[in-house]
Each structure stands twice: as C-alpha cells, then as structure tokens.
C-alpha cells in the first residue's frame, strides 16, 4: 500500500482503516497462540487468536474496545504473541518515569476476562512497552531527550506480578522514557540501534557504542537532540535488512529501507529520513 521511497522523501497520506485509524502492528502467529494486550494503565488482557473475528485481508477489522474491556481512555501499548503462558522466560516492562520490571512469564498464566494487573504504577506514571526475554538479554532504555542506558537484564532481579519495579534510568527534569529495546545474547556483537526524532531525522548506531553499565544511572547520549531535530521518538534494535515505516502526527507515512539510514556515532543528529512539514512531527 505504501511505495518504498528513498531516504529523505516527503511520504504519503496514510490510508486510514476507519475513524482516522492506521495499521501499526502486524503479528504472525498460530490460531492456538495467545495474544497478550498490555495497556498504559499497567493491565494485561488475553485472547486466543482463534477467538478473534476472522476477516479477509482487505477488511477493516474490529475496534479493540469490542474485544477487550478497556476502561475510559485506557490504550494498548504492546501486543505480544505466545504459544504457552507457562513458558520459560520473562516479561520485561518499562515505564514512562524510568522504572524497569522483570517477571516470569508463568506468573501471568491466570489472566481473567477482566484482565489482570501486570505492573503496579504510581500516579503520573504509565507503561511504555513490554518485551519477552530469555534471561540473558541486554536492555536499552531510550528517553525523549535522547539519553540511553544499556544494562544486563538480570540487573533487575525478577519480582512478582503486582509489583512496581526498580529504577532503570534516572531521568533529568521533565524527560521521559519513550522506548524499550532488548538485545538477545546472540545478537549483541552485531546489533545496531535505530533512533528517530520528531523532525524526521534518524541514524543507526552500533550497540557496542553504548557502554554496558549498571541500571539506575543517567545513561549516555544516544541521539543528539536539538531544536532542529526535535525530541527522540524511538530507539529500536535493527539488523539493517528491514524496512522502516515512519509516521507523523498528521497521518503522513513513509516507507524506506533501514539500510538507507546512515550509521553514525551516538552524539550526532542523524540524517533526514523523512521531510516533515512545519507544524507536524514524527511520532513513530
């Protein structure tokens, strides 16, 4: 639907699914897999894939509120697919205020229709993202002001389901966490982190440039943020052979190759990935 463009293109108006909605996630799974929906309020809901309404490729689909008993303005932040809820491994959680939590997957086996508390949140905090790990991954938290901290996941000891977590990154001023990346053991030598900013700039930086340190520090510069770049919107691991979809607040989207985004050091502003109009900003 979105023709690939060279880096630095203008993008195109996103094709809206319904009510100004756009497609933001595609998961591959078996009909017997579970889908887990984690929300900004720190709750998790569960559905079997075979219980979801079946539709053809061009169908608009059902609104998430027709599937899950979300409350008020509760929104889904992460969707994960799992074959078994008693599987080995961990869920790693990151919150807006810099907390990190690691809990065994099997602690979430008894999710009811009404959902379950996945992480306790204090007033003013919200869940940003959840990832699955095997216990040996490195974790990287990225912030709106371009800071990043890398630490081993076992630096956050595993805790029970209804717990708050511990400090992952110590934030300055009004900074907030915008992304959570986990890098498996086998990818640590070759991994790169892709960072994107509100003005449409981006770069790839080798994971090795992010020093491994203990959790709870202030981290290092992951992307040099200025008035020209705008805030950082994401910091995510890439291999270099993927395609990138970048979306703005006004519904403009560009599709390009990650390999066209230049590789650069941590403390740089990156290259123009997308031309963003005045008054608009990249959001993902």
Region roles according to the model:
Residues 1-284:
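Short, structured "edge-of-domain" segments at secondary-structure transitions
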């Amino acid at each position: 639907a979105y023709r690939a463009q060279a880096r630095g293109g203008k993008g195109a108006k996103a094709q809206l699914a319904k009510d100004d909605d756009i497609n933001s996630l595609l998961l591959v799974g078996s009909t017997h897999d579970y889908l887990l929906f984690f929300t900004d309020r720190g709750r998790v809901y569960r559905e079997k894939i075979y219980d979801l309404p079946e539709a053809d490729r061009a169908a608009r689909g059902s609104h998430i509120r027709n599937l899950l008993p979300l409350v008020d303005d509760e929104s889904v932040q992460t969707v994960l697919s799992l074959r078994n809820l008693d599987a080995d491994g961990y869920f790693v959680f990151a919150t807006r205020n810099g907390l990190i939590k690691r809990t065994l997957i099997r602690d979430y086996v008894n999710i009811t229709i009404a959902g379950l508390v996945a992480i306790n949140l204090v007033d003013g905090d919200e869940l940003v993202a959840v990832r699955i790990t095997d216990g040996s991954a490195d974790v990287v938290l990225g912030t709106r002001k371009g800071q990043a901290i890398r630490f081993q996941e076992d630096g956050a000891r595993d805790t029970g389901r209804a717990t708050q977590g511990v400090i992952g990154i110590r934030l300055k001023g009004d900074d907030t966490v915008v992304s959570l990346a986990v890098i498996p053991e086998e990818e640590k030598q070759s991994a790169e982190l892709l960072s994107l900013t509100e003005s449409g700039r981006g770069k790839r930086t080798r994971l090795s440039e992010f020093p491994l340190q203990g959790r709870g520090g202030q981290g290092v510069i992951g992307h040099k943020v200025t008035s020209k770049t705008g805030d950082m919107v994401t910091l995510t691991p890439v291999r270099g052979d993927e395609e990138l979809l970048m979306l703005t607040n006004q519904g403009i989207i560009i599709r390009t190759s990650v390999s066209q985004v230049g590789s650069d050091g941590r403390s740089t502003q990156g290259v123009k990935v997308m031309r963003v109009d005045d008054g608009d900003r990249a959001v993902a």
